[in-house]
Amino acid sequence: MERPLVFYSISLFLGCFFSIIFNENIYITVIIMLVIHIIIYLTLKEIKFTIIMFLFSILGVISFNLYFSFQPKTGALIRINNKYDYKVEGTIKGRKLILKNNIKKLEEGQLIKVESGDFKRNVVYEKGIIGEYNIQHYVLQNRDFRSKIYNLKRNINNKFINSLGKKRGSIVVSLCFGDSSYLEKEDKDNIKKLGVIHALSVSGFHLALVYKIFEIIFTMKFAIIASYLYLAFTGFKYSTIRAFIMILVLKLSDKFYGEYDSLSSISLAFLIILFLKPYAFMEIGFMLSFLSTLGILMFNKKISKYIYFLPSKLNSAISLSLSSQIFLIPYSSFTLKELSIGFLLGNIFFMPIFSMIIIIGVIGAILCPFKYIFNVVVLVLKNLCIILEGSTYILIKVCPDLIYIEEIFGIFIISIYICFMMYKAGKVKYKYLPLFLLVAVFFNAYTVFPKVYILKNEKVKATIIKYKDESIMYCDYDLEEGKYIIELKDNFNIDKVITNAKGYLPIHIKENKLKAINFYKEYFHKNIDNYEGYDIICMKSNDYKEYKIIFGKIFRIR
């Protein structure tokens, strides 16, 4: 069988996937895996290959259950990964857990030994969290390699921010080391609008640049070691682990075998990461990294051939940008719910600047003990940041806003892909099938009958009204809770926000006037009662009520 690693990685994924579907019930999962692989055998007629695939699926089931059935014991060593205002996230033997109670003095990167505390199993599958540890007493362990890395990273981050200023320093730190915690929301929104938000989280692009720098200056072995150190320095992100494995396979194949298959390489990376972290396929960052790379591997050269008449640099930038989005767009419609129309502009104009900032920034991090050399690096970075700010200002003016997309759009894109493949295979009659889904996409985007969303929690009260191509939100909230309003505006794709409105203001809907401003006013009290309170407001969850007004009658949708 050609490219067996592709099939083995799919089998491992199926084992993990069905394990979560059937909530760790091993017996049902194994039976389903057996049935699937019997069908595979009847199709391929290859018994040895099918058995190996089945074993990989069983490996996925075992890995998943071993991960989530783990029970920490007193005296366990826990690594502190992330610290928030109200909780701390740590890892114990590769498993994530939430730490509570005695956590005020904990810092990221520290290694602690829990002397006393209670563990409560509270699994969050999509984040790989096995439960909560209520810590009573702990002992801080001596600094090891990873804690020293965390401390070094903090010092370097602070040095860049102090030298460049908070705004520019945070951009450099985000681009070079993937730490966007210092970044201002305005900068994040601008970069997101331009479709280059991936540059703020360390990706394979970053690691490839770092590897190339050290390979040119030194040797391949030194470059691999330096890349691994960069991997550790940036926190072992999925995208960098994937890129490191693929680079390692590429260099080893060049040296020992002379043949490199990119699809087998990415499949091996997928298999290794999923075996170690069987929940990874539920994390958006993992899927974005693999789907974008898969799109590049499969379609970059094909797109490049179609635009052969363009200059080579422009051809490369456009083909890379378009191919990386082929699988990301449908996936984003099911998860992120938003799409940047200006991603092509962002990638063409920004990626060269980002590349220079990353290269100079990494060199600056290495040479930061040398004051005068570091000052020269800071001067270069300042000028690059000025160029970046000017480019951002211009492109933001011409780049269209993010658009909100729903699942039906993703289904439409997938149908186009399927119909195109069938058309290429000679099934000409299927080429018009996406047109039927296009009608559904239109009616989904254009609200024929008015929709009303009712939201309420302890901090924010809001009514959202959508009609035709417009959407208005009326909300009542305290000034310090403004971040919730921003979240609502982004998640519901709001055109206009009216805050703390008094009395009734008419909204014209066909011949009728819908006089609903604050949902706690009498109009909706006559039709809707028993409001629930929620802790989180997000359209991606079910924390809202939806109503549709059809010919003056109100119907509850959810």
Regions found by a protein language model. Name each.
Residues 220-225, 258-272, 308-316:
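Short hydrophobic alpha-helices at membrane interfaces in multi-pass membrane enzymes
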